[in-house]
Amino acid sequence: MLSSPATAATHLVSLSVWGTQGTGVSGHPALGASWGFITFSSTASDLFIGDTNRAEDCFFRDSTTGQLEVLSVSTAGVLGNAKSLKPVPSVNSLFVTYQSAASNLVDGDTNGKLDVFVRDRVNLTTRRVSVATGGGQANGDSTYPQISPDGRYVVFASVASNLAPTDSNALSDIFRHDLLTGVTEHVSIGVNGGPANGVSLYPAISGDGRYIAFQSTASNLVAGDSEGRTDIFLRDMLTGVTERISVASDGSPAERNSGYPDLSDDGRYVIFISMARNLSVGDTNNYNDLFVRDRATGVTTRLTQGIAGAQINGSTISPEISGNGQVVVFGSNASNLVPGDTNGVADVFTVQLATGAIRRMSVSHDGLQHGAERSFQQHISQDGLFVVFSTASGNLDLGDGNGRQDVFLAY
């Protein structure tokens, strides 16, 4: 594995319609196919005229034109009356999903729960998708939405018990909603067709919506799961088969917890973090490392190695893989992934799957690292060339002077 000292070009992107900084906290950024199309949420009330709801809102920004568009509005254009966050766009950025506590984004929202919505940026419509087939409201909170790159499917976690007839466990489960047919399907299903016996979270979806990865404490999703750990699973929605991903190349299960999965568009590569020491030879650092499972070859590889092949001296968090399966972005507080990392806080890095080259992205254009504020909430573009992340550091862009957490684009 190689560590690359190459620096990134970093730009502030959580700006108002006038190109100025807001007075609130901005975060949860995401990218579509284009580096210029960015979604994020913000508590700022001065990003556009008329923001009077005193709540976090979701935005779309075209960095090539400076256009800023509010996403957390009803079809009639009314701002949500409660917090909206975690916007994620389809590849073409025409559809954006997000979660919201607002009750006025669609008619008939009376459940008083966190729901998942999709904003159609072409037709300027807003639709609730955390519903049962037929449109029945969820009786529990729905969170962690992700949208398939083609914009057809949305996956999410929900503690609701009325979204599918197979759900009776009163625990968080994973669901997939088809925007074309309106059908909501239960994803985290046991081997006997019944509900999972544990908590399932953090879904990720392939390009065509066929494969869905998620983490779960359940022991009945696959046969022979008796370790009592949080594992990574992948469900094939076409065949109805679930496989365990957090295993070594010889098929032995991870002996410690694993989490935060993501997968390439074709479903071949699944990434995750794990404390397990048996997924890779020589893993004795007792930190969360980053792994990739190649479903075509059955090989599991550790991606986080430090300078000169050393084990990393910190943990890894929230990885995401580019749609083409070539680059992974992740956060880490390790100080030995690249030379010169002396700030003592979490940074954002990328790793090339083909070469293992690691690059720190959360630096200024001239290579200046940030100070006491961590960088996190990282997201990578479809082609793996661009990264967005959040940080309260004020020295990554000369135009950053608000003293708040902002969103940055790096490449």
Task: Kindly give the residue locations of the regions a language model identified.
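C-terminal segment of classical bacterial N-terminal signal peptides
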Residues: 1-6
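Conserved "turn/edge" positions that cap or connect secondary-structure elements
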Residues: 7-411
